[in-house]
Amino acid sequence: MRTDINCDMGESFGSYRIGEDEKVMPCITSANVACGWHAGDPMIMARTLELAARHGVAVGAHPGYPDLLGYGRRNLETFPGEVRNYILYQIGALAAFAGAAGVKLQHVKPHGAMYNLAARDERTAKEVIEAVKAYDPGLILVTLAGSLCAQMAADAGLRVAAEVFPDRAYLTTGQLAPRSMPGAVIHDPEQVKERVLKLVRTGMMTSIDGRDLALRADTLCVHGDNPGACLLAASIREALETSGVRVVAMGAQ
């Protein structure tokens, strides 16, 4: 069995530092690099891609809404076509830096509110898919396991990586529990490790109300802006490899 560990990276901005990219990068196999709209800037993008190349980590674009103040976690009203073009713009920006760093983009993973809305809203999912296909139909689209977007992307012929968040609580619907809900983010590395092992052994994840959800996991996400992200990523990787699971980039699966 094989799986991927991904992390949102390059989410600092100017003098503001978010995450532990230098410590986390050696523990993961795919990096989702912010493209300057919800976080990141040209200097951060360049440094993050160079760091990923140094550690042999595959990279992808992590586009979000134009919302630095809200860190891309607020829903924004958009007109038809805007989400598609927001994503195209950001993929193009990151691709320029990727080319300069001598690396190729592997995937696209929308950020925050855009990601969550695409998981359940047909128009948003359609525009995400259109953007990826317009730029490069060979790119992998990372989206929530079991979501509307995952099914629509597969139907459209895209390569899909179904994503599971071991450090996030799930609703019984399969959606992520809102961050405003108590217990929505799990910080205990041991609890996260137990969830990962249950997932790889049974294909099930326990929801916030104790029910089991069947989830396909092509890639596991660790949130780089959480305290102790480095310890968490290392713990997950060790648990997987000890259980005989090969941890490789999603494009190598």
Curated annotation (Swiss-Prot):
<dbReference type="GO" id="GO:0005524">
    <property type="term" value="F:ATP binding"/>
</dbReference>
<keyword id="KW-0067">ATP-binding</keyword>
<protein>
    <recommendedName>
        <fullName>5-oxoprolinase subunit A</fullName>
        <ecNumber>3.5.2.9</ecNumber>
    </recommendedName>
</protein>
<dbReference type="Pfam" id="PF03746">
    <property type="entry name" value="LamB_YcsF"/>
</dbReference>
<dbReference type="InterPro" id="IPR011330">
    <property type="entry name" value="Glyco_hydro/deAcase_b/a-brl"/>
</dbReference>
<dbReference type="GO" id="GO:0017168">
    <property type="term" value="F:5-oxoprolinase (ATP-hydrolyzing) activity"/>
</dbReference>
<comment type="subunit">
    <text>Forms a complex composed of PxpA, PxpB and PxpC.</text>
</comment>
<comment type="similarity">
    <text>Belongs to the LamB/PxpA family.</text>
</comment>
<dbReference type="InterPro" id="IPR005501">
    <property type="entry name" value="LamB/YcsF/PxpA-like"/>
</dbReference>
<comment type="function">
    <text>Catalyzes the cleavage of 5-oxoproline to form L-glutamate coupled to the hydrolysis of ATP to ADP and inorganic phosphate.</text>
</comment>
<keyword id="KW-0378">Hydrolase</keyword>
<keyword id="KW-0547">Nucleotide-binding</keyword>
<dbReference type="GO" id="GO:0005975">
    <property type="term" value="P:carbohydrate metabolic process"/>
</dbReference>
